[in-house]
């Protein structure tokens, strides 16, 4: 199942409530403010802080 980019209009980072960007190659939603990457599993974003991975600097 593919991620529906229309979801980007309504989802937000659960930590800072900021915008998320879609990384198609890694299948992640990225919060640049918090430097976190949220996984997308089977087209469903997992927006849980404890599942996020820190972005490499």
From Swiss-Prot:
Pfam family membership, one: Trm112p
Residue spans crossing the bilayer: none
InterPro entries associated with the record: Trm112-like
Cystine pairings recorded for this chain: none
GO CC entries: cytosol
PANTHER family: PROTEIN PREY, MITOCHONDRIAL (PTHR33505:SF4), ZGC:162634 (PTHR33505)
Membership in a protein family: Belongs to the UPF0434 family.
Protein name in UniProt: UPF0434 protein Spea_1772
Record organism: Shewanella pealeana (strain ATCC 700345 / ANG-SQ1)
């Amino acid at each position: 199942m593919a991620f529906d980019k229309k979801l980007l209009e309504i989802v937000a980072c659960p930590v800072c409530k900021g915008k998320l960007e879609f990384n198609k190659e890694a299948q992640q939603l990225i919060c640049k403010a918090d430097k976190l990457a949220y996984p997308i599993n089977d087209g469903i974003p997992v927006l849980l802080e404890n599942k996020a991975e820190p972005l490499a600097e």
